[in-house]
């Protein structure tokens, strides 16, 4: 069955603001929230579950600027396996409903709380609430030359890692006991009366962080958190062709989890230093090259810069200021692995200054030797100007 358009699912158009999308999501999610179907038939529960999943899938994409741009460009194909988006399709894990509904809209502190994987319409009451550690972001500054050719960099960053003394358990001698707060369930349930009726929600136990276990005796080194601050050194391979603002993901190099889950990820954000000569647009490089008046008139050869040194190019006779010349294949290597961009040279004619009397005299004689045929644009402009004045007088 084909997926519905995400904008249609939330009932908004493509130009809807972030706030409008959030309001539409809240309204739709409240309508199909599982607690409202507690006494419904199995068929109604199943239908509501599918709609609720669809609503949250749509919101997870449209509320994220990067994913929204991918969806607008590629549609659902952006998020299919191997597509241009986030690869594995929609996953509710780690999605913070509390950001939309607030901590108390459906009861106790976590919004939809334990509605993990959208299995809240039934099933086992004992689930795994192990959460991954936090992701980290690192800004890596490189030169344009390094971006063009690729480079290996070594970075150092601080993160919250596992405590070496308790191996991340938080317990002295690794001895654990059943969490008394949640009785080993990993979650706590809360009920609250709202205008929609009594709402029940589940949230991760704040004491055991969803594991159902707590230390018999807390580790004296980490005080029971199972984590410790550490400095990590990592070699980063920056591929040739990468652009400013693009990210490199290193799975598992983020912060440690407090609930025994996997580490978060490390995202390297590339920042390219401004260049003295070139401006980059995609895989092409743009630069301005000044030429003399005589070279512009008579033509000739000039040296233009590239990332691999200088290259001699021909300047056509009669070149005007602002004329563009393409130097093929001297731009940035495509990140996709094939082809290179170009260098686009913009010629600017430099007007000579501080002329001697003799030079001025020669230039004046040269100017007097010219006629309308030598100035096509000027002649054309004067004809049009003359016609305008004639029409006004008539």
Curated annotation (Swiss-Prot):
A single GO BP: chaperone cofactor-dependent protein refolding
InterPro entries referenced in this protein's UniProt entry, alphabetically: DnaJ (IPR012724), DnaJ_C (IPR002939), DnaJ_domain (IPR001623), DnaJ_domain_CS (IPR018253), HSP40/DnaJ_pept-bd (IPR008971), HSP_DnaJ_Cys-rich_dom (IPR001305), HSP_DnaJ_Cys-rich_dom_sf (IPR036410), J_dom_sf (IPR036869)
Matching CDD domains: DnaJ, DnaJ_C
GO MF, any single term: unfolded protein binding
GO cellular component: cytoplasm
Segments forming CR-type zinc fingers: 150-231
Chief location of this protein within or outside the cell: cytoplasm
Subcellular location: Cytoplasm
Cofactor remark: Binds 2 Zn(2+) ions per monomer.
A Pfam family matched in the record: DnaJ
Binding site for Zn(2+) 1: 163, 166, 219, 222
Domain J span(s) in chain numbering: 5-75
Cofactor(s) named in the record: Zn(2+)
CXXCXGXG motif repeats: 163-170, 179-186, 205-212, 219-226
Keywords: Chaperone, Cytoplasm, DNA replication, Metal-binding, Repeat, Stress response, Zinc, Zinc-finger
Residues reported to bind Zn(2+) 2: 179, 182, 205, 208
Function comment: Participates actively in the response to hyperosmotic and heat shock by preventing the aggregation of stress-denatured proteins and by disaggregating proteins, also in an autonomous, DnaK-independent fashion. Unfolded proteins bind initially to DnaJ; upon interaction with the DnaJ-bound protein, DnaK hydrolyzes its bound ATP, resulting in the formation of a stable complex. GrpE releases ADP from DnaK; ATP binding to DnaK triggers the release of the substrate protein, thus completing the reaction cycle.
Subunit structure: Homodimer.
Protein family according to the UniProt entry: Belongs to the DnaJ family.
Comment field on protein domains: The J domain is necessary and sufficient to stimulate DnaK ATPase activity. Zinc center 1 plays an important role in the autonomous, DnaK-independent chaperone activity of DnaJ. Zinc center 2 is essential for interaction with DnaK and for DnaJ activity.
UniProt name for this protein: Chaperone protein DnaJ
Organism in which the protein naturally occurs: Fusobacterium nucleatum subsp. polymorphum (Fusobacterium polymorphum)
């Amino acid at each position: 069955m084909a997926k519905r358009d995400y904008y249609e699912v939330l009932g908004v158009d493509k130009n809807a603001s972030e706030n409008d999308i959030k309001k539409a999501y809240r309204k739709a999610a409240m309508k199909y929230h599982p607690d409202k179907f507690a006494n419904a038939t199995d068929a109604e529960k199943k239908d509501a579950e599918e709609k609720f999943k669809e609503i949250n899938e749509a919101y997870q994409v449209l509320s994220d600027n990067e994913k929204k741009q991918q969806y607008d460009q590629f549609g659902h194909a952006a998020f299919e396996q191997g597509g241009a988006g986030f690869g594995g399709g929609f996953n509710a894990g780690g999605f913070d409903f509390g950001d939309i509904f607030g901590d108390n809209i459906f009861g106790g502190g976590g919004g939809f709380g334990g509605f993990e994987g959208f299995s809240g319409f039934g099933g086992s009451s004992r689930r795994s609430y192990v959460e991954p550690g936090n992701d980290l972001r690192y800004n890596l500054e490189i030169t344009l030359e390094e971006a063009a050719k690729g480079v290996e960099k070594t970075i150092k960053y601080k993160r919250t890692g596992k405590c070496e003394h308790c191996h991340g358990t938080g317990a002295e001698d690794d001895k654990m006991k059943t969490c008394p707060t949640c009785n080993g369930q990993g979650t706590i349930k809360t009920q609250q009366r709202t205008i929609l009726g009594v709402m029940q929600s589940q949230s991760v136990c704040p004491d055991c962080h969803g594991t159902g276990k707590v230390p018999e005796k807390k580790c004296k080194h980490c005080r029971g958190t199972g984590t410790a601050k550490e400095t990590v050194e990592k070699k980063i391979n920056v591929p040739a062709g990468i652009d400013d603002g693009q990210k490199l993901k290193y799975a598992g190099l983020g912060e440690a989890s407090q609930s025994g889950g996997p580490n978060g990820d490390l995202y390297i954000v590339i920042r390219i230093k401004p260049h003295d000569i070139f401006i980059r647009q995609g895989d092409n490089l743009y630069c301005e090259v000044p030429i003399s008046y005589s070279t512009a008139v008579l033509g000739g050869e000039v040296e233009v810069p590239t990332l691999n040194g200088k290259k001699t190019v021909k300047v056509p006779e009669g070149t005007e200021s602002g004329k563009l010349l393409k130097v093929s294949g001297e731009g940035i290597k495509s990140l996709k692995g094939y082809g290179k961009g170009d260098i686009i040279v913009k010629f600017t004619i430099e007007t000579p200054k501080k002329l001697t009397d003799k030079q001025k005299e020669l230039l004046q004689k040269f100017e007097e030797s010219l006629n309308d045929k030598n100035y096509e644009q000027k002649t054309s402009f004067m004809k049009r100007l003359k016609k305008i004045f004639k029409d006004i007088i008539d």
